[in-house]
């Protein structure tokens, strides 16, 4: 027996850390993304793009999933993707959406203009401008009478 024994939880964390993807961009519900999905048919493989709005992002670790919705010929199409699946080649974030819900079920009843989501502007990086101690303003001169 080995000197150090791993618990089941430690083994699970170790295996998951090897399989988890690091190249997933930051996005959330309401954002428009393109998922490049690898499809294998017979001996050929090809990449299929699926562009739509993220309706839900759920779970953590290897079991994290997203639901992406798009309208195709007036019919709503939703697809569930496992984020850390090897079938996903890459994910591109096209537009940042401004929503106040984590699960956008109300988009299912809407189509066209009413299904639009406002755009969220990315936060600007605020530069900290600190003046050095020697750059202080000189003290005001005292009034002479």
Curated annotation (Swiss-Prot):
Q: Is 4Fe-4S given among the entry's keywords?
A: no
Got a GO cellular component term for this one? cytosolic large ribosomal subunit
Which Pfam families has this protein been placed in? Ribosomal_L19
Where composition is biased (Basic and acidic residues), the residues are 112-130
> Region labeled Disordered — which residues?
112-145
One GO biological process this protein is involved in is:
translation
Sorted keywords for this record are: Ribonucleoprotein, Ribosomal protein
Q: Which GO terms describe its molecular function?
A: structural constituent of ribosome
| Entry's family note | Belongs to the bacterial ribosomal protein bL19 family.
Cited function: This protein is located at the 30S-50S ribosomal subunit interface and may play a role in the structure and function of the aminoacyl-tRNA binding site.
The protein's name in its UniProt record: Large ribosomal subunit protein bL19
Q: Which organism is it from?
A: Malacoplasma penetrans (strain HF-2) (Mycoplasma penetrans)
GN (gene name): rplS
